[in-house]
Amino acid sequence: MVKLSIVLTPQFLSHDQGQLTKELQQHVKSVTCPCEYLRKVINTLADHHHRGTDFGGSPWLHVIIAFPTSYKVVITLWIVYLWVSLLKTIFWSRNGHDGSTDVQQRAWRSNRRRQEGLRSICMHTKKRVSSFRGNKIVLKDVITLRRHVETKVRAKIRKRKVTTKINHHDKINGKRKTARKQKMFQRAQELRRRAEDYHKCKIPPSARKALCNWVRMAAAEHRHSSGLPYWPYLTAETLKNRMGHQPPPPTQQHSITDNSLSLKTPPECLLTPLPPSADDNLKTPPECVLTPLPPSADDNLKTPPECVLTPLPPSADDNLKTPPECLLTPLPPSADDKLKTPPECLLTPLPPSALPSAPPSADDNLKTRAECLLHPLPPSADDNLKTPSERQLTPLPPSAPPSADDNIKTPAERLRGPLPPSADDNLKTPSERQLTPLPPSAPPSADDNIKTPAERLRGPLPPSADDNLKTPSERQLTPLPPSAPPSADDNIKTPAERLRGPLPPSADDNLKTPSERQLTPLPPSAPPSADDNIKTPAERLRGPLPPSADDNLKTPSERQLTPLPPSAPPSADDNIKTPAERLRGPLPPSADDNLKTPSERQLTPLPPSAPPSADDNIKTPAFHPQRMIISRHLPSVSSLPFHPQLHPQQMIISRYLLSVCGFRFHHQPMIISRHLPSVSSLPFHPQLHPQQMIISRHLPSVCGGRFHPQRMIISRHLPSVSSLPFHPQLHPQQMIISRHLPSVCGGRFHPQRMIISRHLPSVSSLPFHPQLHPQQMIISRHLPSVCGGRFHPQRMIISRHLPSVSSLPFHPQLHPQQMIISRHLPSVCGGRFHPQRMIISRHLPSVSSLPFHPQLHPQQMIISRHLPSVCGERLRGPLPPSADDNLKTPSERQLTPLPPSAPPSADDNIKTPAERLRGPLPPSADDNLKTPSERQLTPLPPSAPPSADDNIKTPAERLRGPLPPSADDNLKTPSERQLTPLPPSAPPSADDNIKTPAERLRGPLPPSADDNLKTPPLATQEAEAEKPRKPKRQRAAEMEPPPEPKRRRVGDVEPSRKPKRRRAADVEPSSPEPKRRRVGDVEPSRKPKRRRAADVEPSSPEPKRRRVGDVEPSRKPKRRRAADVEPSLPEPKRRRLS
């Protein structure tokens, strides 16, 4: 037993706080005590000592502490501290003061007379008590308070013991406090609050009143000694008079002081336990939270915390609320157990529910131990038809003598394939059962050849006789249960891993059979004939197969190129059997083609019936790079890539197809039906000879099995389509074509991928082989936005209603190109490229561009609006116009050469080869208000000589930046007009620009007179940034006609003052016309800043430029078209070929 003697004398307590703390700590260090509460109590005692108290006249006070455990020291020191505080309070009222001269005593002497007779409010009882200290405190109150403090200290010790135990347990097991432990602490707090209330009720009101005043005085003394603002003996009523409001109720941490004092109390003052009050609510200080209450009859769920760690005995109302550590052992079966058993109990075997002498039942299999279940369990008798698919592989319980079905009981690890179907399977069985072979039920027959190894099967299997009409495509490979002697259907029993291709169609397939039936041979029913070639191995087939005899009148369009059976001497149609690699052009038309033949007949060379004429270019066969025929009424047209090292190909696209797509192929023609709602192309072997793509008309869905080079999944109404990989060493392709697919996605494949859809909300592009020259095309009609990643050579994004179109990079070593075709795009831009040029109509609903070999010669694609098909071989210029062209001819007519009917003029330059055209052609007079956006980058000419027309002749590659804007640009002018130079206001006139040779035009032509007033936001921002002030803008109608006319447009020039504009080549060297200078070369003094129309004052001698609607009709004659020009004029009428 260790004894510690601490002597507390008045001289010892009169020391300052720092010295007292050091001396007490020296005594504490001399004692080997493991408890940390000893130092904490000593420090608290040093902080709350009272100087000047003689402790009842006693010279010193010896405190003998004997502790067998460390907690006895804490209890004894707390009692000593309480006695010291109470003795000081009691004797303070008797002694008054000791004559000291410090601030505290002087404040006491000054306030005693003012506080005499006043009554304050107790913070606990909320009653008015006397402010005199030391009265009505008897020995009974002290003893009651001592018992309460002891209970409070024991609660602290109990809390520490429980916390130490739990923390030690968590430290060993490496776990944190669980929700159950937290609930245990909350219950302990509730027990502690009940104990507090129990002891507070035993304290008489007289002791409570005195203690309230004592606490208030001790707090004020502590603030004075610590240097904080000090109000001596501040009572609740004095605080109310000073602050002007009622003091709030005490908080949980500071329930002993008022609001203003609690905010300034340092944290070391909160370590002193306060005596409880009888009317304290549940917000007792937290140091007594873990005090357990004595057990009562209604404490069933409020078990002490140390008893919660052991599992409670099961009760009737304990369903699933058992603690988690008690769930490690299986619970006994309950009568009200439902199917919602916790997941941790699902792996525990149930105890036997029947006696050992009871006969085994079918349900005993469910009670087998989990480690013995090496194969799936048999199904239960009450399973309905909606059992999950894993039940199909579960063997049935033995209920009959051994039969053919006993193979199902084979262990799962020995089953090499799926199990056979059951007799009671309905028609809606999942697809995995369809590939299950049937048990042997007949001797081998001649049809067992289907079991031949797959490497020896050179062609598809014959069709089956009992295929129904609406069977899904995966059921074609599903064997039927044996119901007859061996027949041709036994081939279906071949294991699925030996089937190298899809099974042939059935003989009773209706007209909606999938397209794979077209290439499937019929079963032998006659002596060898011409149809036996179908059984020839695929690598030996040099041409397409002939049609079948039972094809109805609605056969797809591939019959047009299909040779008929030999019924007549050789004719011109036999050329169809020629290998595709030897066909340099399209085949001639057939005799039975009706008037609605697809557009491929338009490129078919006709027999010679007339001498060569200008129209013979349309009949020219395929040319070196490519030929494209694009119909007039196609809502969406897709472009097709091809082999880069081979010769050209011909793509024939029908007129009324809703969706047309093609894919990369070796060297082949493509025939596409006319009325197909969905068109798909079929893949084939890439290393073989020609091929033919047959596209069905009435098939709702077309699918094929996996084969060597490619796979194609085409569907019309599929909600989702996924692509499958194929041979990586070949040059295959995968095409996913759908009409109503909400989303289309596919995996990466070797060369390229095309995703074409009409109503797809989103289209994503995929990468492909980087060493080839493939292409990715995303064509859509109603896509709100189209984006794609970078790929090897090119990318084309074609859309009709896209709000924005962005160009993508492509092969860096080649001469790239960028083709962006759109009808209603607010801005259209295209880069200069080496191989080809595209002239795109303005009114086409959908236009598609085609890439070609980058090392070949250039190409020009002319897409007409009213021509059903236009093509040419190695055409250096566009085709001549037709006789039936209306006034709304597309813009490509501007480059159409006129037949030689007059001496050489400026229009002859339109026949210049496309590769020499440096810029777009000038706009026509009949252009509507929606001028293309390529005029946005065209600079305006300066407002002073050198004239603005010279800038147009400057080479485009020397222009470092756009030209400055014009001063008379209105706010609603189209964006392409902002940088467009205006024509000069004197001869040579601005209309001559149209006649300028195309190869000498370095920039876009000036705007037309009928441009609308909708200026883009870019011009408004630039103009607003430049102008120093913004006066009120006046319209042209409100201004008086100025004496000096404005700069007139092309349409404003009178015919008499409009001489023919000379070309750049016609200008003599001595011409005073200076060379066009760049923006940076113009001197600031000669190039004043052009003002906006809004900045021009009404009194300015040079008014602003008026709009088109403000020009008087008499001064703006209507611009005549080419057809309205009389023959007597110097400018000849553009004549047509007819």
From Swiss-Prot:
Residues 349-359 have a biased composition (Pro residues). InterPro entries: NPB13-like_MII_rpt, NPIP, NPIP_N. Residues 252-262 have a biased composition (Polar residues). Pfam families: NPB13-l_MII_rpt (PF20885), NPIP (PF06409). The gene is NPIPB4. It comes from the Eukaryota. Belongs to the NPIP family. It is found in: Membrane. Keywords: Membrane, Transmembrane, Transmembrane helix. The chain crosses the membrane at residues 63-87. Residues 241-263, 291-620, 873-1138 are annotated as: Disordered. It is a single-pass membrane protein. This is Nuclear pore complex-interacting protein family member B4. Residues 406-416, 448-458, 490-500, 532-542, 574-584, 908-918, 950-960, 992-1002 have a biased composition (Basic and acidic residues). It comes from Homo sapiens. GO terms for cellular component: membrane.
